[in-house]
């Protein structure tokens, strides 16, 4: 392990998440307060919580992130694009969309590109107030794909305008692995972000993902990861 980061430096890699169906308003408010204190990169919540989180974080450097087509990716592209634009208009700075997993498994590059492009165009469009768009992360759900399909999904995401590729929703059969992060980094090169999400629970887990090429970490256990230098 050659990566060495202070707690403050590591915090800037982390999207602190609360994405379970039973997440309450009290849970969200607690996550926001803890995330502000820790100085993480973003708070990632389901779209229903975007207005609250964006308002609570308005005077901080912590960004508001939400999820699109989550967790299955089985919505139509039009629905995903609408969901993304609605979330951005409500205050989201970043959106994490789930790909059409079936298209990736079938090797259908054109369908993948079309799906991601619809959301990329919605995410990157200037809003009605002229306040710009949002960063787009594309979840490929690595646990459901072989290596060839992971490469295809990452290539399609980049072609379609993604800013990041992301390993997992955290709601499938497995989460991020060092091997998949490294494969995704090799595939997209240095100009695109790579987010490791799902099963990253300790500081050692996070540093291993960063060593493999991750530039963002999604974690529901952000405070545990940041617990000590």
UniProtKB/Swiss-Prot annotation:
Residues at the catalytic site: 96, 166, 195
Superkingdom of this protein's organism: Bacteria
Pathway, per record: Carbohydrate degradation; 2-deoxy-D-ribose 1-phosphate degradation; D-glyceraldehyde 3-phosphate and acetaldehyde from 2-deoxy-alpha-D-ribose 1-phosphate: step 2/2
Pfam families assigned to the protein according to its UniProt record, in alphabetical order: DeoC (PF01791)
Any one GO cellular component localisation term in the record: cytoplasm
Keywords for the protein's UniProt record, in alphabetical order: Cytoplasm, Lyase, Schiff base
Record-listed E.C. numbers: 4.1.2.4
Gene Ontology biological process: 2-deoxyribose 1-phosphate catabolic process; carbohydrate catabolic process; deoxyribonucleotide catabolic process
Localization (cell): Cytoplasm
Enzyme class: lyase
PANTHER family given in the database record: DEOXYRIBOSE-PHOSPHATE ALDOLASE
Name recorded for this polypeptide: Deoxyribose-phosphate aldolase
């Amino acid at each position: 392990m050659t990566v060495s980061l202070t707690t403050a430096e590591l915090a800037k890699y982390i999207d602190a998440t609360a994405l379970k169906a039973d997440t309450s308003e009290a849970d969200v408010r607690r996550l926001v307060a803890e995330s502000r204190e820790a100085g993480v990169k973003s708070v990632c919540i389901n779209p229903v919580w975007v207005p609250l989180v964006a308002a609570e974080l308005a005077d901080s450097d912590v960004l508001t992130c939400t999820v699109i087509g989550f967790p299955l990716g089985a919505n139509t592209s039009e629905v995903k694009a609408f969901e993304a634009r609605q979330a951005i208009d409500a205050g989201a700075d970043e959106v994490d969309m789930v790909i059409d997993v079936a298209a990736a498994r079938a090797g259908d590059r054109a369908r993948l590109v079309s799906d991601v492009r619809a959301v990329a165009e919605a995410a990157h469009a200037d809003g009605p107030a002229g306040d710009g768009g949002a960063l787009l992360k594309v979840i490929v759900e690595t646990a459901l794909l072989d290596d060839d399909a992971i490469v295809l999904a990452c290539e399609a995401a980049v072609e379609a305008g993604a800013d990041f590729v992301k390993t997992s929703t955290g709601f499938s059969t497995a989460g991020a692995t060092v091997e998949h992060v490294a494969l995704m980094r090799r595939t997209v090169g240095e100009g695109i972000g790579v987010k490791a999400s799902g099963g990253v629970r300790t500081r050692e887990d996070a540093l291993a993902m960063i060593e493999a090429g991750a530039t963002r970490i999604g974690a529901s256990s952000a405070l545990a990861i940041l617990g000590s230098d």
